[in-house]
Amino acid sequence: MTAVSPPHPALTPEALAAIYAHARREHPNECCGIVYGPKGQPIAARAVACVNIQNELHAEDPVKHTRDATTAYNLGAGDLFKLGKSLRGEEPAKIVYHSHVDVERADGAYFSETDQAAAQMDGEPSYPVEYVVVDLRRDGVRGAAQFAWDPGARRYVEIGRYPG
Protein backbone atom coordinates (compact mmCIF):
# COMPACT_ATOMS: atom_id res chain seq x y z
CA MET A 1 0.00 0.00 0.00
CA THR A 2 1.21 3.48 -0.85
CA ALA A 3 0.18 5.82 1.94
CA VAL A 4 -1.42 9.17 1.20
CA SER A 5 0.58 11.96 2.82
CA PRO A 6 0.24 15.75 3.22
CA PRO A 7 -0.57 18.01 1.57
CA HIS A 8 -3.03 15.47 0.17
CA PRO A 9 -6.11 14.73 2.31
CA ALA A 10 -5.96 11.24 3.79
CA LEU A 11 -9.16 9.34 4.50
CA THR A 12 -9.73 8.49 8.15
CA PRO A 13 -10.40 4.79 8.88
CA GLU A 14 -14.03 5.69 9.66
CA ALA A 15 -14.49 7.52 6.36
CA LEU A 16 -12.92 4.64 4.43
CA ALA A 17 -15.20 2.13 6.20
CA ALA A 18 -18.25 4.27 5.34
CA ILE A 19 -17.20 4.45 1.67
CA TYR A 20 -16.66 0.69 1.47
CA ALA A 21 -20.03 0.01 3.14
CA HIS A 22 -21.73 2.37 0.67
CA ALA A 23 -20.05 0.63 -2.28
CA ARG A 24 -21.20 -2.79 -1.06
CA ARG A 25 -24.79 -1.54 -0.57
CA GLU A 26 -24.97 -0.16 -4.11
CA HIS A 27 -23.60 -3.25 -5.92
CA PRO A 28 -24.14 -3.91 -8.83
CA ASN A 29 -24.32 -0.14 -9.40
CA GLU A 30 -21.51 2.33 -8.92
CA CYS A 31 -21.71 4.33 -5.73
CA CYS A 32 -20.65 7.96 -5.41
CA GLY A 33 -20.20 10.45 -2.62
CA ILE A 34 -18.22 13.29 -1.11
CA VAL A 35 -15.82 13.33 1.82
CA TYR A 36 -15.47 16.51 3.87
CA GLY A 37 -12.78 17.52 6.33
CA PRO A 38 -11.58 20.38 8.52
CA LYS A 39 -10.43 23.47 6.66
CA GLY A 40 -6.65 23.75 6.44
CA GLN A 41 -5.97 20.17 7.53
CA PRO A 42 -5.05 17.22 5.28
CA ILE A 43 -7.85 15.06 6.69
CA ALA A 44 -10.94 13.72 4.91
CA ALA A 45 -13.14 12.57 7.78
CA ARG A 46 -16.87 12.76 6.99
CA ALA A 47 -18.05 10.59 4.10
CA VAL A 48 -21.47 11.49 2.73
CA ALA A 49 -23.15 9.02 0.39
CA CYS A 50 -24.76 10.65 -2.64
CA VAL A 51 -27.36 9.29 -5.03
CA ASN A 52 -25.97 8.14 -8.36
CA ILE A 53 -28.42 9.69 -10.85
CA GLN A 54 -26.90 7.92 -13.87
CA ASN A 55 -29.87 5.54 -14.27
CA GLU A 56 -32.25 8.52 -14.39
CA LEU A 57 -30.12 10.28 -17.00
CA HIS A 58 -29.85 7.09 -19.06
CA ALA A 59 -33.63 6.56 -18.93
CA GLU A 60 -34.31 10.17 -20.00
CA ASP A 61 -31.82 10.21 -22.89
CA PRO A 62 -30.05 6.92 -23.68
CA VAL A 63 -28.42 8.44 -26.76
CA LYS A 64 -26.66 11.16 -24.76
CA HIS A 65 -26.15 9.03 -21.63
CA THR A 66 -25.27 5.68 -23.15
CA ARG A 67 -24.22 4.00 -19.90
CA ASP A 68 -26.31 3.14 -16.86
CA ALA A 69 -25.26 3.11 -13.19
CA THR A 70 -23.57 -0.28 -13.48
CA THR A 71 -20.75 1.38 -15.44
CA ALA A 72 -21.04 5.10 -14.68
CA TYR A 73 -21.84 7.61 -11.97
CA ASN A 74 -23.22 11.11 -11.94
CA LEU A 75 -23.69 13.37 -8.93
CA GLY A 76 -26.95 15.30 -8.91
CA ALA A 77 -27.21 19.08 -8.97
CA GLY A 78 -28.07 19.24 -5.26
CA ASP A 79 -24.94 17.32 -4.27
CA LEU A 80 -22.77 19.46 -6.54
CA PHE A 81 -24.30 22.59 -5.01
CA LYS A 82 -23.42 21.33 -1.50
CA LEU A 83 -19.90 20.51 -2.66
CA GLY A 84 -19.42 24.01 -4.07
CA LYS A 85 -20.92 25.70 -1.02
CA SER A 86 -18.71 23.68 1.32
CA LEU A 87 -15.57 25.08 -0.30
CA ARG A 88 -16.32 28.43 1.36
CA GLY A 89 -16.92 26.91 4.79
CA GLU A 90 -15.07 25.37 7.72
CA GLU A 91 -15.54 21.78 6.50
CA PRO A 92 -14.83 21.82 2.76
CA ALA A 93 -15.16 18.90 0.39
CA LYS A 94 -11.79 17.17 0.09
CA ILE A 95 -12.56 14.04 -1.95
CA VAL A 96 -15.18 12.82 -4.42
CA TYR A 97 -15.43 9.04 -4.49
CA HIS A 98 -17.03 6.41 -6.67
CA SER A 99 -16.75 2.70 -7.30
CA HIS A 100 -15.85 0.64 -10.33
CA VAL A 101 -17.94 -2.53 -10.27
CA ASP A 102 -16.83 -5.95 -11.50
CA VAL A 103 -14.43 -4.51 -14.08
CA GLU A 104 -12.65 -6.76 -16.54
CA ARG A 105 -9.13 -5.94 -15.42
CA ALA A 106 -6.98 -7.01 -12.50
CA ASP A 107 -7.26 -3.68 -10.69
CA GLY A 108 -10.55 -1.81 -10.73
CA ALA A 109 -9.23 1.12 -8.66
CA TYR A 110 -8.12 3.25 -11.60
CA PHE A 111 -9.04 6.70 -12.88
CA SER A 112 -10.45 6.05 -16.35
CA GLU A 113 -10.34 8.43 -19.28
CA THR A 114 -14.06 9.01 -18.68
CA ASP A 115 -13.27 9.89 -15.05
CA GLN A 116 -10.50 12.25 -16.24
CA ALA A 117 -12.89 14.05 -18.60
CA ALA A 118 -15.69 14.31 -16.03
CA ALA A 119 -13.36 15.79 -13.41
CA GLN A 120 -12.14 18.57 -15.70
CA MET A 121 -13.49 21.65 -17.40
CA ASP A 122 -11.42 23.26 -20.14
CA GLY A 123 -8.40 21.17 -19.15
CA GLU A 124 -8.46 22.21 -15.50
CA PRO A 125 -9.96 20.57 -12.40
CA SER A 126 -13.68 21.29 -12.07
CA TYR A 127 -13.35 21.41 -8.27
CA PRO A 128 -10.33 21.65 -5.92
CA VAL A 129 -10.81 18.08 -4.69
CA GLU A 130 -9.10 14.74 -5.08
CA TYR A 131 -10.76 11.51 -6.16
CA VAL A 132 -10.96 8.02 -4.68
CA VAL A 133 -11.98 5.04 -6.79
CA VAL A 134 -13.08 1.82 -5.08
CA ASP A 135 -12.47 -1.59 -6.69
CA LEU A 136 -15.74 -3.43 -5.95
CA ARG A 137 -16.34 -7.04 -6.96
CA ARG A 138 -19.15 -9.49 -6.31
CA ASP A 139 -17.12 -10.89 -3.41
CA GLY A 140 -16.46 -7.49 -1.84
CA VAL A 141 -14.12 -4.52 -1.88
CA ARG A 142 -10.57 -5.20 -3.03
CA GLY A 143 -9.22 -1.75 -2.19
CA ALA A 144 -9.18 1.83 -3.39
CA ALA A 145 -6.82 4.35 -4.94
CA GLN A 146 -6.61 8.11 -4.55
CA PHE A 147 -5.92 10.51 -7.41
CA ALA A 148 -4.75 14.13 -7.40
CA TRP A 149 -4.33 16.74 -10.11
CA ASP A 150 -0.82 16.90 -11.56
CA PRO A 151 -0.44 20.32 -13.22
CA GLY A 152 2.65 19.20 -15.16
CA ALA A 153 0.92 16.15 -16.62
CA ARG A 154 -2.40 18.04 -16.87
CA ARG A 155 -4.30 15.04 -15.54
CA TYR A 156 -5.15 13.19 -12.34
CA VAL A 157 -2.49 10.75 -11.18
CA GLU A 158 -2.49 8.08 -8.51
CA ILE A 159 -0.99 9.25 -5.22
CA GLY A 160 -1.88 6.45 -2.84
CA ARG A 161 -3.74 3.22 -2.10
CA TYR A 162 -6.03 1.93 0.61
CA PRO A 163 -6.38 -1.78 1.43
CA GLY A 164 -9.67 -3.62 0.93
Residue ranges of model-derived segments:
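Conserved beta-strand-loop surface patch within small alpha/beta domains used
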Residues: 1-93, 102-164
